[in-house]
Amino acid sequence: MLRLPSRIVFPFGYRISVRQISDTDMDRRDPNADGIWDDDAKTIYLRKRLPVTRRRYILAHELGHAWLDWQHRHLDNGKAKT
């Protein structure tokens, strides 16, 4: 079985942490969410109790949010060119 990564690195050294947290910790952030992208902390939080297939799906979804933030910082602000 493939494990979920604890860190992902986008181009230009944009590092993202992936944390699998308890229901209590997730509920403090957002009781209605199973996954959260925190742009300030550059961290994706996933609800640990969910089946791994569901966590993978949520990770992919949250990576989409992270990618858009990366794009805004590096492409839209002129740090990189397509």
Residue ranges and their predicted role:
Residues 47:
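Residue-level recognition of the GNAT/N-acetyltransferase active site
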Residues 61, 65:
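Histidine-centered divalent metal-coordination motifs
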Residues 30-33, 43, 52-57, 68-82:
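Post-HEXXH active-site segment of zinc metalloproteases
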Residues 1-11, 17-43, 52:
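Catalytic zinc-binding patch centered on the HExxH motif and its immediate surroundings
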